[in-house]
């Protein structure tokens, strides 16, 4: 009898611990989502207009925990409410937040920004610097500008029942943080607002490409998902920067 009671007690203890783990996990996810939304508002609330704000035309379609340079981050994806090009590699507004609430990056990939005149390099640098001053001032302390040049991001669209890829081009302000050797950049779109921002990126010098994961870039994410079961090393995945 004592043995049966001991066995039953052990089973109940296991189930109770499992229940507590699941409960804490769900609470943690909820808090993370709330903190991410709050942090985005805090990080961008002081920025001109709504350059890094979640567009009113979009809604949250996915949110998950991933790793960036071996550290936990939260990836959130917003797609258009009207369903226009609402698929992987299509239009989206995405954010990446660190566990401490730091905005690690965001991307606003919109068809509205394609095929329009771009601001000058001088104007783009001014816009990028002002964005950093308000949203990530710590990056300005030891900043070394590397380049200011046009850069394109692909977006797949459906037009008249046919799928095609167009390029959303902006002016990329690329710089290095001399304090730790990491890289960061701001891409200014045709509307003279930041359309993409990434920070604390690690670089593979010998391979002339970034080491950090590319969670804001659908082409990389798609390849990651497709090869996930094969556990393919990330060095074999496509790199866009």
What are these regions, as identified by a protein language model?
Residues 2-4, 11-241:
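Long, terminal "pre-/pro-" and other extracytoplasmic accessory regions
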């Amino acid at each position: 009898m004592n043995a049966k009671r001991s066995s039953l007690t052990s089973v109940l203890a296991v189930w109770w611990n499992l229940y507590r783990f699941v409960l804490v996990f769900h609470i943690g996810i909820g808090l993370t989502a709330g903190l991410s939304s709050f942090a985005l508002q805090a990080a961008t609330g002081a920025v001109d207009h709504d350059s890094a704000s979640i567009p009113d035309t979009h809604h949250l379609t996915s949110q998950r925990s991933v790793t960036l340079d071996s550290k936990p981050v939260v990836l959130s994806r917003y797609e258009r409410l009207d369903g226009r090009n609402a698929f992987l590699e299509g239009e989206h507004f995405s954010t990446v937040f660190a566990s401490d609430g730091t905005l690690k990056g965001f991307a606003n990939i919109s068809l509205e920004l394609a095929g329009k005149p771009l601001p000058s390099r001088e104007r783009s640098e001014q816009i990028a610097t002002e964005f950093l001053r308000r949203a990530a001032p710590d990056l300005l302390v030891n900043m070394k500008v590397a380049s200011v040049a046009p850069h394109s991001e692909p977006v797949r669209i459906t037009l008249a029942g046919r799928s095609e890829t167009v390029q959303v081009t902006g002016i990329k302000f690329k710089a290095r943080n001399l304090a730790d050797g990491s890289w960061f950049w701001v891409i200014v779109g045709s509307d003279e607002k930041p359309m993409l921002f990434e920070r604390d990126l690690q670089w593979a010098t010998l391979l002339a490409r970034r080491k950090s994961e590319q969670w804001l870039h659908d082409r990389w994410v798609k390849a990651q998902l497709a090869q996930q079961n094969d556990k393919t090393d990330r060095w074999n995945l496509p790199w866009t920067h």
